[in-house]
UniProtKB/Swiss-Prot annotation:
It comes from Clostridium kluyveri (strain ATCC 8527 / DSM 555 / NBRC 12016 / NCIMB 10680 / K1). GO terms for molecular function: ribosomal large subunit binding. The keyword 4Fe-4S does not apply. It is found in: Cytoplasm. Signal peptide: none annotated. InterPro entries: Ribosome_recyc_fac, Ribosome_recyc_fac_dom, RRF_sf. PANTHER family: MITOCHONDRIAL RIBOSOME RECYCLING FACTOR PSEUDO 1, RIBOSOME RECYCLING FACTOR. This is Ribosome-recycling factor.
Length: 185
């Protein structure tokens, strides 16, 4: 029973870290990264569609993203969606390809990005701690039902605390790496 609870907690914690890694990948780092387009959806034949499903995205140079729609009629819609987004990048449309030139990051922009990284990381840590709390609540519920002994509960609580500590250290390492990446560009 405890093992099942711990395994589910492990899965949830891994998913939390995966979400963090994806979110951090989508944060601008002064170089071209197709992940910055992941959250942008384009109105295409009446449906909101991710850019990645409408076009090939390549990186011809370190700070340039090239978006080549499979259907040329989607060019204007893609351009409009990028302009509406919070990317802060003006697309260059030559009728075939949309180019996004990623600007150099200013010191102020870097600090804002690092602040967002820290907030995102803190949200992930809160989620991990919430998973720990859920597990401890489940252990206490089992104790009330007299399904497990006090010793087993203590052992389970220690194990979930160890997992929590490991995942939080992992998140800290991921955040530190991303912060260094942003500040060293």
């Amino acid at each position: 029973m405890i093992k099942d609870i711990l395994n589910k907690a492990d899965e949830k914690m891994n998913k939390t870290v995966d979400v963090l890694v994806k979110e951090l990948a989508s944060m601008k780092a002064g170089r071209a990264n197709p992940a910055i387009l992941d959250k942008i959806e384009v109105e295409y034949y009446g449906a909101m569609t991710p850019i990645s499903q409408l076009a090939g995205i390549s990186i011809p140079e370190a700070r340039i993203l090239a978006i080549q729609p499979w259907d040329k009629s989607a060019l204007k819609s893609i351009e409009k969606a990028i302009l509406k987004s919070d990317l802060g990048i003006n697309p260059s449309n030559d009728g075939e390809i949309i180019r996004l030139i990623i600007p150099e990051l200013t010191e102020e922009t870097r600090k804002n990005i690092v602040k967002n990284i820290k907030k995102t990381g803190e949200d992930s840590k809160v989620a991990i701690r919430g998973i720990r709390r859920e597990c401890n609540d489940k252990f206490k519920a089992l104790k009330k039902k007299n399904d497990i002994s006090e010793d087993e509960i203590k052992k389970g609580e220690e194990q979930i605390q160890k997992k929590t500590d490991i995942f939080i250290k992992n998140i800290d390492a991921i955040l530190e790496k991303k912060e260094k990446e942003i500040m060293s560009l």
